């Protein structure tokens, strides 16, 4: 019997993970962001939040699952272990970067953008960064 069958740790992880991308979900993001901001405030440490959204050539209300997976993969491969990526609504991804000032956050997101631009199916990325 696996941990998932017993309601063990992997079962808990699936409750907070987006099935399509493997990123944490919006609920996990909301709780985690509050905690990380409080920690940054207490320790007077920098914290950055980046919001990412792929830009598609075709106007559509429906996000593309393949593009969403490509964005998620590029984000995860670029981030440090301490950083957190979460899928919000549709094709939007939020990234929490602890101990990261504005220039570090911009540099990190630029690395994600370049990785996506050089992928077999290039993706254009719209991004914004906010810092504490």
Pin down the residues of each PLM region.
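A short glycine-enriched loop-to-beta-strand structural element that forms part of the catalytic core
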Residues: 48, 87-98, 121-132
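Conserved long alpha-helical elements within nucleotide-processing catalytic cores of c-di-GMP signaling
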Residues: 12, 17-51, 55-77, 86-90, ...
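Hydrophobic, well-ordered secondary-structure segments
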Residues: 97-102, 116-117
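Short low-complexity stretches enriched in small and charged residues
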Residues: 2-9, 50, 81-84
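A structure-centric signal for secondary-structure junctions around beta-strands
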Residues: 44-46, 82, 124
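Regulatory sensory/coupling modules that transmit signals to nucleotide-handling catalytic cores
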Residues: 1-10, 111-114, 124, 131
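Intrinsic-disorder/low-complexity coil detector
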Residues: 3, 8, 45, 62-64, ...
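Short catalytic/binding micro-motifs of nucleotide second-messenger systems
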Residues: 39, 77-84, 113-122
């Amino acid at each position: 019997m696996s941990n998932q069958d017993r309601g063990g740790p992997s079962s808990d992880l699936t409750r907070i993970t987006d099935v399509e991308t493997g990123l944490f979900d919006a609920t996990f993001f909301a709780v985690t962001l509050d905690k990380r901001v409080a920690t940054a405030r207490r320790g007077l440490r920098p914290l950055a939040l980046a919001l990412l959204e792929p830009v598609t050539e075709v106007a559509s209300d429906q996000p593309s699952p393949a593009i969403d997976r490509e964005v998620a993969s590029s984000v995860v491969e670029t981030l440090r272990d301490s950083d957190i990526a979460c899928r919000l609504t549709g094709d939007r991804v939020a990234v929490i970067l602890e101990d990261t000032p504005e220039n570090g956050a911009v540099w990190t997101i630029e690395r994600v953008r370049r990785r996506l631009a050089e992928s077999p199916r290039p993706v254009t990325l719209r991004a914004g960064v906010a810092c504490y």
